[in-house]
């Protein structure tokens, strides 16, 4: 059976939430919580690798017994776009298949991880988590998903999802070939509102911490 390596990317710089990866979060940190969550999956994973340009974060990973990858500072900077970052990450980490696992999604359950891995094993196609949205959306002065002359109730809007990036499971070869963690063949696993939370702002951090504490008390 081909191997699955969970990859946890973290970097020094955080433009909106300073030191968010190691900042105190529910008595721990986002990095530590993610590592422990992945370790709890046991034999479902073959390896866990933390990729970072930060010595302190790499030290945390080593203390928790997982592998590390020293990321080039250029690929940890805002100078590279997502595609460049994804391709470099896949080229730098060994393993048949990679499970992209950012620390900014701390509320993903063990059941969801298992569901994603099971789907990947059974169907053999990339897997990515998504969140369904039902909003009247506009771009460049025009509605995107409805007609202004016949505005539907929100529940009747077309099914549109956005990538949460909470779990993205893909073969290493596909990740390099597509320079991405998703492809046109990806199977989408829908998350609920709680699990789809992604920390990008100070408010996100506070809300996620409150919900994490509520869920784990």
Language model features with spans:
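N-terminal glycine-rich phosphate-binding loop and ensuing alpha1 helix
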Residues: 3-51
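Histidine-centered beta-alpha loop that forms part of the nucleotide-sugar donor binding/catalytic region
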Residues: 11, 73, 131-132
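Short phosphate-binding loop-to-helix
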Residues: 55-99, 107-115
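Alpha-helix/helix-capping structural signal
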Residues: 55, 173-174, 203
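Conserved core of the sugar-phosphate nucleotidyltransferase
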Residues: 82-85, 106-195
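Structural beta-sheet core signal
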Residues: 6-8, 50, 100, 126-128, ...
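Hydrophobic helical membrane-anchoring modules
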Residues: 195-217
